[in-house]
């Protein structure tokens, strides 16, 4: 007869997912009775996985016996001999306690809370775990340390052999405690007493899952140390329980595997299924071994293997609680959503980018040099901040921010560095590189049974709660009594923030690993020494002790008497007030720091003791102001240089175009002269067009009279006359060079005068304030802002004989007589510095100008008019001249002259933008300017109105026009009566309000110019343009009139006089006005 054995039931029911945020907020780990704990541990590659809302479902095989569920989220390795009770085992123990009577343990610490609730859904009946036992037995739960949870792959582990179970029969609390260490002891630890139960009767009944049987048990739970590497195959969905009878009883481990997964890749399915089949074979072998063991101990009841053909029911896996901690920002988040939003936030990204930049700069410099401005600074490794002095560092250590970080790291079990400051220098940076790397590699070393654990490469700052809770250093004396049985030791990437503490970080590695780490540290420090010595150009680094002493002893506090205490009604000091700096503070330490500060010392030197030595420390703002000033000066010099080059290029292009035109005219004249000398004389069907600039192309036959090429329209007679007149009135090369020379000299001399006046004004206003230069606002604009070319000089309309040009000097304030006098005084001295030639300078208050005249030949004159944009802004703002005149200084210059100078500036800009690029426009304007100077009738025509009229007439044409046609079109416009009073007039495009440019002309002057234009148009129609231009007639280029019609003319005109000459004699009295 087979005896009925008691059945030990382990029931895991998935807990609700909604309480994660609450538990993670206060570092609260809620392990509910009868529910599976939720874990998320960082894998070997430094990657943490979090469970989604819909977790994978587990399907457990059914067995025909009693209903007991074993569904854990950890698969310990069977090869580990160490007997311990990690956090997952504690959870299983809590579940077992709930099944056996609702055991509620008493806690030594308040960090963990347990709550018991009944499972909402009855669990499905899984296979039974049955054992044979004696009357008196010891019940010890034995499992390998489950230290990792991989949510992507689930593998079955081989069943524990009887030898392992027998070895696990004896409790070993000392070894377990030495293996799992915790510095702050955030978990709880009770006496590890074996569970003993004496049965009075041999009849036992099957325990139902919903009906707990009375039992008492004592458990010993040790927090898991994060120093152990996560196992690669630690994702199996089963727990390997091991029970030992005292002294002759041991059972096989039972494994259950789920075969239904959701939300994972197909590769994981195939890997899990193949591994599952292998484990089923191992289960069969384990069952045979169990039968043999039972026979050896006198028992005849063996464990039945689970059936593979039963229907599988899905069961959701447990989801462990997570602690969301960001290593970069050193903060914890309430939940996954908050943590995700933090990672996507700007603050985190900025800190991460700054960290990467600092790491790259330190790595590029060989790890031995720091950035500029960080030398001799005290650094807090925990908060990753640098302080400029010992007082600032002490205030930071006492501050709320540092204390908050310390509290958070204490909760998470992270190592807290020593509060002793580390001086940021070349030697300290290189010395901390090796310990960081070694300690981090030791922390992340652990057993590994598969290479799949390194398949993830994404970075994450999420740390597991179980891992973070036990990452501190241990206090046990037997810390190194456990050796780690590992197939390979892997090193993961070091975290982005390395904690370098004052004490050595203790890990669970063996002594050999520690010796290797020390050797690596020595080798790396030795390797960094020649790298530092290789940089000969770098100064020798100051030792941390000397730098710290220098920071502490350099500055002595001054001005204690000027800091008064402010007390409340009870006489208690509530704050301090500095009368020198007009500031308040409520911390005595801040008072000492303020008395040593540079701001207070500067105020003390300014108001109390001028002899106090204060180091000159150029601030970032002062340096930026200086750089901005230099940049503006370079830009201004570049602007003037480019402007001179553009002006030179414009003049050269204009001369080049005129030379090309005249070359073509000469070639055409030679061509027609050659044709006129030919014996046949002329062409029967009209002359063809003249050849190009290079003559007839080689190989091209000369056109025959019977089939000539369609002729190109030659330049008309009017074009020849206009271009000949333009060449006559164009300035010579000597005149152009003389004008360019005197203008350039004047501009450079005015620049020097502007510098002198600016320095004088700045020196007068800065007396007694030299110590506050770096705190001042940027200096105001200089009084003389710049000089601009205006009039015919800027427009390129100079004529032969023009000796006067105009410049405009812009001022930042309204120009006054005093300013004009100062410029006249300084300008002659600066002219001698620019050029050795003699120039005469005189000021004209009536014209609001300075007149500069050259003493050598040719005599040139430059008129420099002073003006300011403020004058036009005020007039446009209020429109009342009298009101603005009241505010002006007493010696302000003539307002209208200044406004005319501003208008000349706008006219020059408009002309360069609109008229300069228009074909034949500049030539026609020069012809009309010459006409206004020769003919008194046209002298009343304003030059600005004439420029507007020519530009409008030429730009409104359908296409480009030759000079003769353009001149004819302008005369046609004037002849149409556009200048008369009833006409629309010419509106000034450079004024805000509609302004007629012809408003200054009288009615008689308008009619005279209109009549003269009509008469000139008649002369152009009768081929007498030379009379309008005031030049002699050019020789006839086309001889066909003389050759073909000579005889006919002689017969009709017996006196021998030419028809054009006779007509010219009759009309001589009509064009005498031109």
Curated annotation (Swiss-Prot):
SMART domains with a match to the protein in the record: DZF, ZnF_C2H2, ZnF_U1
Transmembrane segments: none
Biased composition (Low complexity): 417-456, 520-533
InterPro entries listed in its UniProt record: DZF_dom, DZF_dom_C, DZF_dom_N, Matrin/U1-like-C_Znf_C2H2, NT_sf, Znf_C2H2_sf, Znf_C2H2_type
Subcellular location: Nucleus; Cytoplasm
Any matching Pfam family: DZF_N
Compositional bias annotation for Basic and acidic residues: 767-781, 1062-1074
Annotated keywords: Cytoplasm, Developmental protein, DNA-binding, Nucleus, Repeat, RNA-binding
Comp. bias regions, Pro residues: 700-711
Domain annotation DZF: ranges: 697-1073
Any one of the GO CC terms: nucleus
Main location: nucleus
Region (Disordered): 344-374, 412-456, 508-545, 697-718, 761-781, 1036-1074
Gene Ontology terms, MF aspect: DNA binding; double-stranded RNA binding; single-stranded RNA binding; zinc ion binding
Purpose: Involved in postimplantation and gastrulation stages of development. Binds to DNA and RNA.
Protein name per the record: Zinc finger RNA-binding protein
Organism: Danio rerio
